[in-house]
C-alpha cells in the first residue's frame, strides 16, 4: 500500500469513527456519570461566565482544567441540550484522533502500512472510547497521552532540545487534562537514563539525570509547602487511606485483567511477546524507547488504578485503558516481525485460556461494580439475557478466544487475530454503550417531562433546595440541565455526598429560609425526590422530581425523609409545620397511611412522642399538632433499613393530608385493615 492511499484511509477511518460515535452518543438521553459530568460541565460554564473554575459558587479544588477550557465556548450555543450534543460531537472527534499517533508509532517501529491501519482501527473500538458520550476528560486525554508518547519516543530516539521541548509541552497539556499524567514528565528522562546506561554512555545519562532530579526536587518542594491534600485537590483523600501490599497486588491484578479485555483480549499474548522482544533485542533506538516507555507507563497506570480501586472496591479501567493502544502497537510489531509462531506466544496464549476458564469463579466479584470499567460493563448486558449463567458464558468465551489466539498464533495468522480483537472490542463497546443508554433512559423516565424545566420557565439565578436524604446524583442531574440554578442549598442533617458547596438553610419562625442569617431572595427549585414540601404559594412549575417557586416563598409543611419513589419513609427524618398567614402557631393534622415489615414508627421530640405499630397491611394514622410556633417532630424506624436506589428506607408511607387551620384534613376515616390508630402530639 502506497503512502498516499494509507493517509487517505487513515483520515477516512477517523471521520467514520467520529460520525459513528457522535450518532451513538446522541442516542443517550442524559448524563449518567455523576458527579464527574456535572463537575466538568459546571467548570466549563463557570469559566465562560465568570472566568473562575467554580462549582455551585465555590471552589471545586480541581486543577486539571484543560478540558473545561476547551469545552467552555460550546456553552455559547444556547440551550443546555444543544451544548450537550455539541460537546459529545467534539469529544467523539477528539477520541477518534487517537488513531493518528497510534499509526505513527506503528510506522516508527517499521510495521507495514496496512497492518498499522489495522492497529489504528482496533484502537477506535477499545470499549473505553464509550467515554466520548459522557462529559469527561478521557476523550481529550487519550489522544494527548498517545501524542506525548510519540514525542517521548522521538526525543529518546534522536534527542535534541526541540524534541524534548515538544515532549515537555505535550506532557504538561496531558497533565492539564488528567492529573494522573503528572507522572509523564519524569517518565521519559528516566527511560533515557536507562537507554544511555545500557549503551554505557554515562555522560549522556548524567545530562538526562539533571532535569529529572530538578523535577523531583521541585515536586517535593511544592508538596512540602502546599501539602499533599492541596496539591491533589479532590483526590487528596487517596493519600490518607491505608494501602496494604496485598491489596495493592490484588487490585493491580484485577485492573490488569480489565485492561486485557480493553485491549482486545486475543492480542494480549502477542503484545507481551512484542514488548519482551523489543526490550531484549531492540533493532533500533526507537524499539528500545517505545518498549521501555510502554512498560513504565503500564506499571504506573496499574499502580494508580490499584490505589483508587482499594477505595471503591472495583476495577478502575478508567485509569489504565490509555495503555491499551500501546499494547496494540506492540501486537503490530509481533505480527510484522513474525513472532507469533514463537513458543513464548503459545505459552502466554495457553495462560490466557486458563484465566478465561477461571473467570466464572470470581466473575460476580469482578463485574458487580464495573462503573469505571467499560470493558466489563458488557457482563451486565449479558446478565439481562442469560441471568446467573452469564459468568459461565463470559468465562467460556474468554477461554475459547484464548485457545483461538494459541491456534492462530501457531499458524501466523495475525490478520485473523486483529479481526478477533476488533470483534471483541466492538462487542464490549456495544455492551458498555447499551448500559450507558439504559441508565440514561431510566434517569430520564424518572425525571419525567422537560429536564430543563426551570430554564424554560424563565428562571434566573435560582437556588436549588435539597434535603437530608436528597441523593447527590439527583441534585447534579437537575442542576446540570438548568443553568438558571446558581447555588445548591441544604435543609436538614448531613452534608452533600459530592463534596461541592451547599450551604445549610435555617427556616425562620414563619417558614422563611435563611442562609447565614440572610433571607434567601432567589427563586427556589425544590427537590421532590426525598421530601414532601408545601409552600405558602403554588409552584410555578411542577415535575416528578422538583418544583419551581417564586422568590420569597415560605415553607408551610415539610416531611424531610419522604422518599417519593415507591412511597417510603427514611429510617429517620422529621415532620415540620410553620405558622401560616397571621397565625401565631402551627395547628392542624397530618394523615399518613403506613405499612411495612419493620414493626414500629417512633415519634420523638418536645412537641410529640409516641410509638405507632406498623403492620404489613396499610394502616391509617392521624397526628394532630398544636404548637405555639413551629411544630417539629422527629421520626425513626427501629430495625433494619432497606436500600432503595440511593436511599436507606424504613417503612412504606403515603401522605394522605398535611394541613393547618383554617384548612383541615377530612375526619379520621376509622380503623383500617390491621387496626386504625389515632395519635395526638403531646404538648
What are these regions (language model features)?
Residues 4, 257-291, 295, 327-336, ...:
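Hydrophobic, aromatic-rich transmembrane alpha-helices
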Residues 26-38, 49-72, 76-77, 85-88, ...:
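Membrane-proximal lumenal/periplasmic loop motifs of glycosylation machinery
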Amino acid at each position: 500500500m502506497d503512502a498516499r492511499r494509507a493517509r487517505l484511509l487513515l483520515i477516512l477511518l477517523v471521520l467514520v469513527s467520529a460520525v459513528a460515535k457522535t450518532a451513538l452518543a446522541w442516542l443517550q438521553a442524559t448524563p449518567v456519570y455523576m458527579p464527574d459530568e456535572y463537575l466538568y460541565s459546571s467548570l466549563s460554564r463557570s469559566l465562560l461566565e465568570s472566568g473562575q473554575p467554580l462549582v455551585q459558587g465555590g471552589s471545586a479544588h480541581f486543577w486539571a482544567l484543560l478540558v473545561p477550557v476547551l469545552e467552555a465556548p460550546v456553552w455559547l450555543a444556547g440551550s443546555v441540550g444543544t451544548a450537550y450534543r455539541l460537546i459529545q460531537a467534539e469529544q467523539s472527534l477528539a477520541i477518534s484522533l487517537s488513531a493518528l499517533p497510534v499509526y505513527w508509532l506503528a510506522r516508527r517501529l517499521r510495521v507495514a502500512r496496512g497492518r498499522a491501519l489495522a492497529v489504528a482501527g482496533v484502537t477506535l473500538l477499545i470499549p473505553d472510547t464509550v467515554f466520548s458520550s459522557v462529559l469527561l476528560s478521557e476523550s481529550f486525554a487519550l489522544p494527548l497521552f498517545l501524542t506525548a508518547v510519540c514525542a517521548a519516543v522521538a526525543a529518546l530516539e534522536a534527542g535534541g532540545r526541540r524534541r524534548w521541548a515538544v515532549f515537555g509541552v505535550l506532557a504538561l497539556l496531558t497533565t492539564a487534562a488528567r492529573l494522573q499524567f503528572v507522572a509523564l514528565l519524569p517518565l521519559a528522562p528516566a527511560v533515557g537514563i536507562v537507554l544511555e546506561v545500557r549503551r554505557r554512555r554515562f555522560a549522556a545519562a548524567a545530562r538526562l539525570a539533571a532535569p529529572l532530579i530538578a523535577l523531583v526536587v521541585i515536586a517535593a518542594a511544592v508538596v512540602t509547602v502546599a501539602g499533599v491534600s492541596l496539591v491533589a485537590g479532590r483526590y487528596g483523600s487517596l493519600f490518607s487511606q491505608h494501602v496494604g501490599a496485598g491489596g495493592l497486588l490484588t487490585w493491580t491484578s484485577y485492573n490488569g485483567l480489565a485492561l486485557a479485555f480493553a485491549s482486545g483480549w486475543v492480542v494480549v499474548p502477542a503484545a507481551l511477546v512484542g514488548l519482551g522482544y523489543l526490550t531484549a533485542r531492540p533493532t533500533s533506538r526507537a524499539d528500545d524507547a517505545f518498549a521501555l516507555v510502554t512498560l513504565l507507563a503500564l506499571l504506573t497506570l496499574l499502580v494508580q488504578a490499584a490505589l483508587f480501586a482499594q477505595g471503591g472496591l472495583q476495577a478502575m479501567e478508567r485509569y489504565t485503558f490509555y495503555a491499551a493502544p500501546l499494547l496494540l502497537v506492540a501486537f503490530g510489531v509481533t505480527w510484522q516481525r513474525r513472532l507469533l509462531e514463537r513458543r513464548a506466544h503459545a505459552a502466554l496464549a495457553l495462560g490466557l485460556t486458563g484465566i478465561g476458564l477461571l473467570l466464572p469463579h470470581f466473575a460476580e466479584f469482578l463485574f458487580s461494580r464495573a462503573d469505571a470499567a467499560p470493558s466489563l460493563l458488557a457482563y451486565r448486558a449479558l446478565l439481562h439475557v442469560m441471568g446467573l449463567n452469564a459468568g459461565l458464558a463470559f468465562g467460556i468465551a474468554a477461554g475459547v478466544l484464548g485457545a483461538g489466539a494459541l491456534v492462530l498464533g501457531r499458524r501466523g495468522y495475525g490478520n485473523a487475530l486483529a479481526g478477533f480483537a476488533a470483534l471483541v472490542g466492538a462487542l464490549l463497546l456495544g455492551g458498555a454503550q447499551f448500559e450507558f443508554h439504559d441508565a440514561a433512559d431510566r434517569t430520564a423516565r424518572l425525571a419525567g417531562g422537560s429536564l430543563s424545566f426551570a430554564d424554560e420557565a424563565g428562571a434566573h439565578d435560582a437556588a436549588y433546595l435539597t434535603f437530608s436524604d436528597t441523593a447527590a446524583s439527583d441534585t447534579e442531574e437537575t442542576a446540570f440541565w438548568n443553568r438558571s440554578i446558581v447555588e445548591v442549598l441544604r435543609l436538614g442533617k448531613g452534608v452533600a455526598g459530592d463534596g461541592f458547596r451547599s450551604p445549610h438553610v435555617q427556616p425562620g419562625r414563619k417558614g422563611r429560609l435563611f442562609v447565614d442569617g440572610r433571607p434567601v431572595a432567589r427563586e427556589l427549585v425544590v427537590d421532590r425526590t426525598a421530601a414532601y414540601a408545601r409552600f405558602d404559594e403554588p409552584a410555578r412549575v411542577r415535575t416528578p422530581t422538583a418544583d419551581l417557586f417564586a422568590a420569597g416563598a415560605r415553607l408551610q409543611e415539610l416531611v424531610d425523609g419522604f422518599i417519593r419513589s415507591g412511597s417510603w419513609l427514611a429510617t429517620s427524618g422529621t415532620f415540620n409545620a410553620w405558622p401560616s398567614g397571621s397565625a401565631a402557631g402551627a395547628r392542624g393534622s397530618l394523615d399518613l397511611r403506613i405499612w411495612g415489615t419493620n414493626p414500629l414508627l417512633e415519634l420523638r421530640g418536645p412537641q410529640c412522642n409516641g410509638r405507632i405499630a406498623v403492620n404489613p397491611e396499610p394502616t391509617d394514622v392521624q397526628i394532630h399538632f398544636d404548637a405555639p410556633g413551629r411544630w417539629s417532630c422527629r421520626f425513626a424506624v427501629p430495625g433494619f433499613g432497606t436500600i432503595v436506589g440511593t436511599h436507606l428506607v424504613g417503612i412504606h408511607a403515603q401522605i394522605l393530608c398535611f394541613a393547618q387551620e383554617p384548612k383541615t384534613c377530612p375526619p379520621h376515616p376509622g380503623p383500617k385493615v390491621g387496626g386504625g390508630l389515632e395519635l395526638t402530639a403531646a404538648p
